[in-house]
């Protein structure tokens, strides 16, 4: 399925298992204040982004919605993602939370609604998945998926619901390339979406990354984004800097060689910079 989203900036889209599609590169607004988020989303949409990723726990859904609604871009051309907080997990509460997110965003629907964390000790992510299925059925969300789910979490919800997430958004960068989980996702027909693609900035001065960047006359950030896109991921890059937001788009005019991909793949050491989904329980 093709999409006009992102075409102005040359951002391709990938098809999801439910017939919808999503741009392969988007802006994330985690840890940004409301004012920062509103400015960043406005700058991103002006630059050509069409995928915006927020969450209830970020506290900036209203700001994202203001920027989206003020952009003058037709709603159907913008792909908006938000996420269910751990505190709102449950069959009924997840549906209420989805509608509350819509109200804060000032939108009639979201393109993608995700369970933010499995929070396994709470025992509610399976019930929450049922709630998301109902939210999709009711038109609150066009696609539904998960974040930070491992293979066991995925099999639990799929085996019990007979409904497969469209996306699994996970921390993913060369120090944590998630090869096994990407393979699991692909086996289910789930698109892998990468967050933290720059390794919270720790990879920007890594010799392997800077070497590849110099070879292509690109920035380290552009190389890291390109690496993840070439793996077949959708990538969410967070920034509050308009220049970096624009620069991050300049990843579709070059390709990494097989050797360069292998070099970056070889950096994997299982290093996480974000919480471990096996143990994290909130918020």
Swiss-Prot record:
Its EC number is 1.1.1.-. InterPro entries: AKR, Aldo/ket_reductase_CS, NADP_OxRdtase_dom, NADP_OxRdtase_dom_sf. It is an enzyme of class 1 (oxidoreductase). GO terms for molecular function: aldo-keto reductase (NADPH) activity. Keywords: NADP, Oxidoreductase. The active site is at residue 58. NADPH binds at residues 196, 198, 200, 236, 238-240, 244, 247-248, 274. Gene3D superfamilies: NADP-dependent oxidoreductase domain (3.20.20.100). It comes from the Bacteria. It holds the Pfam family Aldo_ket_red. Belongs to the aldo/keto reductase family. This is Aldo-keto reductase Mjls_1918. It comes from Mycobacterium sp. (strain JLS).
